[in-house]
Structure formats: structure tokens, C-alpha cells
Amino acid sequence: MPKRDDIKTILVIGSGPIVIGQAAEFDYAGTQACLSLKEEGYRVVLVNSNPATIMTDAEMADKVYIEPITLDFVSRIIRKERPDAILPTLGGQTGLNMAMELSAAGILDECNVEVLGTDLTAIKKAEDREAFRDLMNELGEPVPESDIIHNLDEAYSFVERIGYPVIVRPAYTLGGSGGGICHNEQELIETVTSGLKLSPVTQCLLEKSIAGFKEVEYEVMRDANNNAMVVCNMENIDPVGIHTGDSIVVAPSQTLSDREYQLLRDVSLKIIRALEIEGGCNVQLALDPDSYNYYVIEVNPRVSRSSALASKATGYPIAKLAAKIAVGLTLDEVRNPVTGTTFAHFEPTLDYVVAKIPRFAFDKFEQADRRLGTQMKATGEVMAIGRSWEEALLKAVRSLEVGADHLLLEEAENADEETLERKICFPEDDRLFFLAAALRRGQTIEQLHEKTKIDLFFLYKLSKSIELENRVKENPQNEAILAEAKRAGFSDAFLATCWNIDEQAIYDLRKAQNLFPVYKMVDTCAAEFESTTPYFYSTYEEENESTRSAKESVIVLGSGPIRIGQGVEFDYATVHSVWAIQQAGYEAIIINNNPETVSTDFSISDKLYFEPLTLEDVMHVIEIEQPLGVVVQFGGQTAINLADGLAKRGVKILGTSLEDTDRAENRDAFEKALEILQIPQPAGKTATSVEEAIKVATDIGYPVLVRPSYVLGGRAMEIVESEEALKHYMTNAVKVNPKHPVLVDRYVSGQEVEVDAISDGENVLIPGIMEHIERAGVHSGDSIAVYPAQRLSQQVKNTIVDYTTRLATGLNIIGMLNIQYVVDGEEVFVIEVNPRSSRTAPFLSKITEIPMANVATRVILGENLIDLGYTPGLAPEKQEIFVKVPVFSFAKLRSVDTSLGPEMKSTGEVMGKDVTLEKALYKGFVASGTTMHDYGTVLLTVADRDKKEAVELAKRFNRIGFTIMATKGTASTLEEAEIPVSQVKKIGENQETLIDYIRNGQVTLVVNTLTTGKRPERDGFQIRRESVENGIPVCTSLDTAEAILRVLESRSFELESMNASEVKQPKVRV
């Protein structure tokens, strides 16, 4: 069937900011789709609110709108651009929900816009829990016994009939938001209340729990001719009951018999045909391990996280082909880009095993509930490929960057029996390590199977790894054992620990017996057809399929799994760096292990190595490729941390030298450099012991900012106000010793300013200066950034440009650097310099039209800024105003405090752009999911130090018609200032308290600043959590509250009676 020529313009809806449950996989899908549609000659219009994505680059679509994905803004774009069709199935849950809203509001009919890929009826049948259940009943496919509920009473009657445990699944939500398994009435009340609030249609499915069944997924494709095929099937190691995004996954499935595989395959194809989906679809099934009984769990009628994993696991580009199918092409007409000879309807065949392990942010959120269930909690994931399950699993473990290079975690090994049992029976993010610890202590695989319902096959494989571990320890430096261990995926670092020698000695042993990995190709067809895919994985076998080309090459290190502090921004920079290397005439090679990202799309680089980012694994690639050098500036802290080890092994680090990187990151060296350059910084010193830290703090005066050196995302950073608090931090948050010093600085509560710059060693280009709305003390990644700076004098800007130029040249930076300053009056202090790409680089690149990672790479490769056409100094500022607003995933992470401070907590970001700051902020807030009410009630409960400032804010809220509620202390201060206020009871008082008002929806905005001390801290935590659970915006910084207020004031009008001159009435604004 030829592609459609009756449509010319297609609107692609992106997925918005990165949140838990919806990460970089949709940047990958959207980028593929836009390029695929342009390839077919269509005019592509894209809307997405996330500036940190490749898909929002101007080259990706004919028109790119970085605007909020809301009914209001998308409708405006449709009316302006008049697309013939929209493609919503590549923008995750956000895209699907937007399409449903546009349809319900009548916009699609009004503007005569067709929905491509999967029609809205099919989306409704898959997403609406009741319609889905009815369809399955029609098809004769079993679903767990269930009921649709819209309130708690309906939930009670279902439980009376079925009994506990039950699973709650809210309709039209992402990553199982609001869902969970309930074992008792208390859990039922909490989960159902939360689920109904989070479902846009106030609907949940309550179903009988089938926890313990095997969970299997099929990634399927179908075209308009009803051709359907399976791209990949995947098996969750964890049984049903743990969200698939939080499960360890293996592809292809390892424990299904042929009969089981074919049974579930047939079901998946039957469902995609019944839904008449044109494109990709994910079917999740539960299989009884003791019979052939199965249940259909759910269907995602769109490209999903699993699609990205299936694409990378097989090499089959699902999103690219789904876009082609959406415009009428069929599977038997489109060539498979991997082989170039076969067509897309050939089902991929795998001659290797793929393991995916999720990455969690619990290192950032120590208070979070780590227990896994049906609501997703992982921020990202890693993937590894091997010839066996054991090899793939161990490669994935060392890709995680959780301080383990093997199935060995100190915490698990040292756990008492009670903790060990709890961690095994009630799964948390680190259960894999506790299973290994239990096997080491002599528990049998049958005992573990009984407790976990994990298939005996996987437990047997784990036990084999532990057995091999024991033989390694018993046979130091034995050649045969070494070879066996390497084939099983053991790392040199772990072997070195076993044999009590250093890692280099292991390498020398391997070199002596020529024991090195070879690289195999991912080709979708298990070598049945000729393939030229430049996509490789390592394994210990005979034949090597990766050959070095005659062209000089450069290796770029990726940033690994997405986590808080190191997100998709670094992947964005990696991809741009690769393109720049290719433009400069070199072969560009990527090493990375994240299946969600654009950088691991094999069509991006000349060669892709899907490998752990460890010294050993990277060195193997370097040895085979012999590159000109390695670029580490764009892979976040992951890549920077490898630079030292690589340089010691004789590898050329391109760009800023290792010594100069160390001068920026090592506190003492940095202080000396600042002294020479005569640039001020807040007073502070390095401490290598608790006593030393107390002395430094006493000398410079409290409050102080304390943090470990060499850190990304403000890990373990805190503002400390007393000696007692400092002692607590030093003993609990960090392991301080001479090797790992702690930095103690005077805390300057000024205005924070951030600068990204590019230096060629002589000239320095500053694309822009961004100011933060929140004052210093809130992590830069969690602050609202504004460009161009609105509150800085010309003198301060000149000082910042001068300091930035001096720092870049004085530290011999070649490439990118990011500097954070704090401005106090007209004084400018340097807080820190990062000699690498930053998380603001994509934002600044988009708005200044200076492709920073691209330019920096050209400079790293030896060109200079003037020859590249750039004038040194500050680039001319744009007329429009741009804001970068952080986005948080607090709703997914219960028991995490939402208060902002020096430790980063946001998972993503959005951009707002307009002609005034207020309009740009409005777009930013709306895009981030903040509900902007033009009237309502503001609840104020602030610390004593903030009360004076809160009076001014309350006056302004009152002036535009808001009612003010406050707790006793804050209310007294407001009454003294003659501001109308209703006093509410604190938590623990007998009558109706402020928590009741929040729960009953009587509050529209909460402003709550941190009080130090135990009780108020606990109360504040509960206020903030209740606000998040009930979807109420909560500001823990008065600066954020003021920004929201500015927006509300700009949307209100003056109202004054005509006879105001007779009796002076106060003005009211609405």
C-alpha cells in the first residue's frame, strides 16, 4: 500500500518533561518518528515542552514549538498550523491523553484533524479499564476478576466479595501512578483515594491479585493491511506485582516452553488485531508457572519504555517503522534499516541474551519508601548484552554505578538475618544483591523460590555465579578459572579483590594468555543475512566482528543510566558531540549502556558499543579501535570519573587536561587558582575529619554549606546552622577521610547566577548568563532559571564576563565549562566551576541558537572560536524571555520530603518563552504541571526568619482576591500588619487542622518554609507531603511563591469604584 498523499502536515505530540515512568525513551521515539516522516516528504510540526531533548532541535521538524502540552496551547498550535493529522502514539501517556482531550473538546473535528497510527476508539479500549475488560471478554481472553470503581464504597463492596490482596490500577495514568497492592483496609483507603485523584477520568480498576505469576511482555507491530508480527518478547525476573519498569527484565524470555511462547504470542497478535492498532503496541501478560493458565494484564497502545528496550535489544527501530506505518506504508514494503536487504515484517532473531536492570534514585532520597510494587519508582535503566544470562546480568550490574562491580553489596553481606529475610520477602531496589548474599549463606534456590516466586532457572543461574566465585577464591591466579570467570561476566575489579592483587595485575595475567573479549554485532537476524550494522557488544569468544576502519576515530563516553542530577541533558550533549566529530571528518564512536536514549540509536554514530562505562570495558574498546582520543566532557560525572584511570593507561583525553580538570574540582588547587586570578569566593576550607570541620565552621561563622568534593547533583550537600547539626551531617551523610575531604563554606544568601561558556584556550565565548529565581541554597537543577538575567546591573554582568574569561583561560579549559556565582549587592563570588557540559547546555543552546556541545567539540578537536565564526565575550542577548522550570516526581516517591535545598530532587525540566517574564513563567509553571488558580486560598506557614517577607507576599495575594489561611505564629504576624487572615490549627491539635483543609480541597496553594528543629520539621514534612498527594502546588521557597504571585498579578485587573474619590476604598484586583 503506497504512503498517503492526501495528508501534507502532521503534528507530532511529544511527551513533555522527564518524570518517573516517562523518561528519555520518548525523546528517542519522537526523534526517530520526526526524521522518519520527513524522510517520506511530510511537513512535520512538533510540540514538546522539554528543551533538553534532541527532538526539540530546530532540524528535527519543519516547525518546533517548545510550549506546554495542554489543551489550551496545543489547540492554539493546531489552529495556527492547520495540520491534516496528529500522531499522538510517540509521546507516551502525555501524547495519548492530549489526543483524547483534543477530541473530547471538539478541536479535532473543528479543525478537521485526523488521528494517525491508532484511532481514538482503540486508545479508549486499551486505556479505559472498563472498555478494555469488555473487549477481553468479547475476545474470550482471561483477565483477573475485577471491578471498575469511582469511589471508596464501590472499592469496599469489591473487597467484601473477593477478599485481600487486591491490585488498584488507575485509568489513563503513567507508570502505575496512584496504583498499588492492598493487603488491608488502611492500604485500600490510601491507594484508592490517591488513584482516583490521579486518574484524569476518576476511575480505577480493582482486581484480584495474581502476584506471583510470571510476567511476560510482547512488543508487537501491525499495519493497515492487518499484517502483524512480534518484534521481541521479554520476561520479567520479578513476578507479577512489581511494575515492569522496576523489574529486572531479560530478552528473549528464558523460561517459557515453546508451547507457552506460542500461546502468549498468538494472544498478543489477536489483541493488536482486535484493537486495529497501526504501529507499535506492548502487551503484558501473566502466566501461571504451574499450568498453561494466563491472564492479560494490560495493553499500551503506543510506543513505550518497553518499545525502546525492545528496539535496542533487537536493533529493530520500532518508533521509526511505527511512524511509516502510521502514514499507510506496510511492513512488507518497508526495508529493515539494520540489514538493508530484508523487510520489516521479518521477526527479529536473537543469538544473545539481553538484561535490563532499573536504576533508582534512593541514593538521593534516603527517607523514601524503597519497597517495590505496581507503582513505578525507577528513574532510569541500564541494558547489557552477553552470550549467556549470567554474563549479561553481571555486565548490567556494573553498568548501574551503585558502587558494585559484581553481585556483592557490602550492605547485603553485613545484614543481619532479619534484615536479609525482609529484603528477600518484601522486594526493594537492591533485592538482587540480597539474593546473592542469601545464596552465600547457604540458602537453597528452592527456599528462595518459595519466598520470592522468582523462577528456579534464574535462581539456579545466580547460584552458579556464586559457586564460580568460590572456585575463583580457592584458586588464585589459575588460568583456566580466570578464563571461565571472564566468560561468565566477572569483572577484573572483582577478580582483583578475590585474589588480593590490583586490577592491572589481572589485566597482565589476561594479556599473558591473550584473554580478551571479542565484539559481536547486533543484526536482528542472528547472522542469517548479511548485515552492516555498526552496533556491537563484547563477549569472550573466538571470532571478532568489529574491525577498525582506516579513518581516524574519536570515542565519546556516554552518561549511563538516567538518575537525578544526571539526566537526558548529558545525552543531548553526547549526540551533538558525535555529530560535530563527524562534521570534522572523523569517525565517531559511542560507548554507552542506556537503552532509552538517542545516543544508543545505532544510526547516530559510526559505531556504537553497548557496554558498561567502567575502566576495563572502555579500555577494551579503546584497544581495538585505537582512537585519536576520548571525549569525556559530555558524559556527566560518569565520564569525568573515568578520565584519571584512562590517562594513567596512556589514553589521550581530548579537551581540558586531567591536571586542569583537577584544578577546578579539587578544592585546595581551585583556591590557589582563584588567589592567582584574584577572583573572590565565599570563605571556606577543606576538612578531612569531624574536628577539623567544626573548627573551620567556627572560624568562618554559621550558617555553612557542607558537601563532599567531586560530586554531581548536590549529592549529600547541606546548609548547616549549628555545631550539633554539623556533627550529625559529618557522621551520617558522608564518610570523611583524607582521601575524601569535605568542603565547608560560608553560606552567602545572595542571588545565584549560572553561566555556560566555551573556551579554545585563548578566546572564551559566553552564550548567556542565567539568573535563578530562588536565592543561593537551592540546587541549581531545582531552581527556576531566567534568561536573559532580569535583575543584574550592567556592572555585575561585566564582572561575571570578566571572571568567566579569566577562569576559563587561567584554568586552561578547552571545551565547555559551567560556572555558578552568587551575587550579593554588587559583589560577585564564585561558588564552583565544572569543567564539562552542564544540564543547562541544551536550554541555552536552543534559546541562543549557539549549538554549544557542537562548538565545544570542534574546539576540543583543535579549531578556534574565531575561525568557527564566533566573537569572544558575551553573545548578544535575545529580546524574548526564557525560563527553565524544574519538574519533580514526588507523587511517585512517597515519604520523600518535597522541600528544596542544596541536594537536587528534580527529574526533569520544561521551558517557557514569551515577551514578558510573567508570561514566560506562566507557560513554564503550566508546562511543569503546576495548577495556576486565579483565585482561592493560600495557606501560609513559615519559619520565623521568613515572616517579615511573608507579610509583603500576603498583602499582594490579598490584593488580587485570595483568602489567606495561616498557622498561629504566621497568622499573628499578618494580623499585626492588618492583613485579613483565618487562623488554622496545627497538626496534633484536636479540632479541624490545616491537614483537613488540604485534604478537603479548600486550599489552592501552600507556602511552607523550613523550620529547624525536630517537631516543626516533622509537621512541615506532613504538610508538604499532603499537598503533593492532593495535587496542590507547594512552595518551600518564598522566591518561588513570589514568582507564582507575579504571574497571578499579571493575569488580574484593577477594580475600583467610580466614587472612590468620595470614600477612599482599598483597591481590589481580580
From Swiss-Prot:
Residues 402-546 are annotated as: Oligomerization domain. Mn(2+) 4 binds at E832, N834. Binds 4 Mg(2+) or Mn(2+) ions per subunit. Residues 930-1070 form the MGS-like domain. Its cofactor is Mg(2+); Mn(2+). It catalyses: hydrogencarbonate + L-glutamine + 2 ATP + H2O = carbamoyl phosphate + L-glutamate + 2 ADP + phosphate + 2 H(+). This is Carbamoyl phosphate synthase large chain. It holds the Pfam family CPSase_L_D2. The keyword Zinc-finger does not apply. SMART domains: CPSase_L_D3 (SM01096), MGS (SM00851). One of its GO terms (biological process) is 'de novo' UMP biosynthetic process. SUPFAM superfamilies: Carbamoyl phosphate synthetase, large subunit connection domain (SSF48108), Glutathione synthetase ATP-binding domain-like (SSF56059), Methylglyoxal synthase-like (SSF52335), PreATP-grasp domain (SSF52440). ATP 1 binds at R129, R169, G175, G176, K208, I210, E215, G241, I242, H243, Q284, E298. PANTHER family: CARBAMOYL-PHOSPHATE SYNTHASE [AMMONIA], MITOCHONDRIAL, CARBAMOYLTRANSFERASE FAMILY MEMBER. Keywords: Amino-acid biosynthesis, Arginine biosynthesis, ATP-binding, Ligase, Magnesium, Manganese, Metal-binding, Nucleotide-binding, Pyrimidine biosynthesis, Repeat. Residues 1-401 are annotated as: Carboxyphosphate synthetic domain. Mg(2+) 4 binds at E832, N834. The large subunit is composed of 2 ATP-grasp domains that are involved in binding the 2 ATP molecules needed for carbamoyl phosphate synthesis. The N-terminal ATP-grasp domain (referred to as the carboxyphosphate synthetic component) catalyzes the ATP-dependent phosphorylation of hydrogencarbonate to carboxyphosphate and the subsequent nucleophilic attack by ammonia to form a carbamate intermediate. Composed of two chains; the small (or glutamine) chain promotes the hydrolysis of glutamine to ammonia, which is used by the large (or ammonia) chain to synthesize carbamoyl phosphate. Tetramer of heterodimers (alpha,beta)4. Residues 930-1070 are annotated as: Allosteric domain. Belongs to the CarB family. Residues 133-327, 671-861 form the ATP-grasp domain. It comes from the Bacteria. Mn(2+) 3 binds at Q820, E832.
